[in-house]
Amino acid sequence: QASSDVTFTFTDGGVTGAGDSTAGYEIDGTALTITSGGTYTVSGSCADGSIKVKKSTTGVTLVLDGLTLTSENTAAITCGKSSEVTILVSNGTENSLSDTEQNNDDNYPENENAENAVIKCKDGSTVTLCGDGELTITANGKNGIKSGATTDEDGEASLTIRDLTLNIDAPVNDAINAEQLLNVESGTLTIDAADDAIHCDLVLNIGADGTDGPTIDITNCCEGLEGAELNVCSGDITINASDDCLNAANSDLTDYDFTMTISGGTIDAYSSAGDGFDSNGDLTITGDTVIVWTANTADNEPLDADGTITVSGGTVLAAGGSSGMDMNLEAAQPCVIYGSTGFGGMPGSTQSSLIAADADFTIEDADGNAVYRGTARCGANFILFSSADVVADSAYTLKAGDSSTEGTAQSGTVSTGMGMGGGFPGGGQKPDGELPEGFDGQMPNGEKPELPDGEVPEMPSGERPTPPSGQGSPTDGNAPAGDSTSDTTPTA
């Protein structure tokens, strides 16, 4: 068993350490291998070095105490199969780990040492990354942190992150990628990733009930948080994504019960070219604050689920280009929807936004009291709002500049499908299902919608009225001018 206080210093010339080379570690040039449990403190700077915890080694605490370490062709830190390791970032210290483009066996198949991550946790390893210091990871090869799978041979695998300040720059692939179980319990994370910011093939937990949770700032990514089972229990999360901000999915799993559950914390998310929250199963929101915007294009949906979307608590503002196709929404807590259905979200739509980008807006009750106040992240044709202040069957007005749009709060099973009816603003049809005056049944792009039987019903007189403008919509067929931003006293 190694001493509980073995200290190593990295330099470009090698690694120096106190104690006998047989006492739980081996040094080979700038490569340090830990072979026995104990506490090991590492510091210094090295342009090409590495730390490895040997397979099946348990009870290891690796203390980063002002370490700057780059590894050219492998991981800077590797936790072997079936190992149990705590990587502790020492209080008040700044530490940096990085690799090079050679640490990627897809691009460098001849590199037998490539681990495809700056920190590699192999199958069956249980790793905790924690401490009160700061760690910056730069992943020039592939991933920032990679955690392995649970296997019969190697045992259960998990990765837990807590307390520390963690900065990850991953210009090639994922910032954090886990195969089995990933718990981000607390700490401050800042992430810039080419692909996923935080990804887990199976279970991803953010925060925990009754805790403040982590602060996560994802400045750039393709997808933000992704797991087959995605649970957000607490935390303060900001996401700027080009695809889905939150995604419950795994293309390698078939016949799986995908779930996305948001029970606490604050999420402020924006997608420039994808869905806001996308679940391949059910999507459930029970608490705290969810603000999600998707760019104002036809196929971007702020909330999207193959199963049921349930809103039963918290403050929820979901705004975007469209409501998508049929949204199976169960509003245990009443929701008010603006621009919900009709033609506004369909491809080829010329519908203008309910609310324009950067517009300040409010949602007010019948007495003029603001139940929500915010600023639009982008233009939106569709806005869903829910909070504890919203009362079923009551009227709420969305106001942005000189524009206002009325809505009525609904509870229970709420239809937001893109049929011929509903959602008069931008929908081209009145809530009662009658064609508005001056409307000839055309889509905004001039194409007639197909009805189930393929026929367009005749008006009672047998003729269609001629639109005043000669076009197929009242005035321009667009939603009321202006932007829509919601504001419920929490601000967006």
Language-model regions: role of each:
Residues 1-492:
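A composition-driven surface/loop motif
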